[in-house]
Amino acid sequence: MAEDNTITAQDALAKLESGELILVDVRRPDEWLSTGVAKGAWLLDMTDENFGAYLNAVLQRNPDHQIAIICRTGNRTGYLQSVLDENGMTGVLDVTEGMAGGPNGTGWIPRGLPIQDAREAYDAMPKDLIAK
């Protein structure tokens, strides 16, 4: 049986706040600006041509942290997680309920979990992970 690499929004928040987890929001920039992002999330647009290299850099430089990915409803991250697994990037957790919620759960924002302006999150990221 396959390993369950999913995590709830509440558990992701707890691990993020304790410093055990890096949360990567893989939505598009217009989505980040529209809704805000999970407080403390790193922003890596999965449609960026360099997304794979950026995500690999996150994994390589943070071997002692769990990495979780989040999108709007969990559909993109579910697909992305399977692609990552097929390419040897295993162990990435999927926040299946996403930011807005959907069939997999209530969602980060509807749960009232902390969010921040996307520009603040972007400014706090390591500069070499920011798309040019």
PLM regions: where:
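Short, surface-exposed ligand- or partner-binding patches at beta-edge/loop junctions that are enriched
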Residues: I70
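Conserved G/P- and acidic residue-centered "switch" motifs that form tight phosphate/ATP-binding loops
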Residues: D25, G74
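Rhodanese-like catalytic fold shared by cysteine-dependent sulfurtransferases
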Residues: M1-L21, P29-Q66, T77-K132
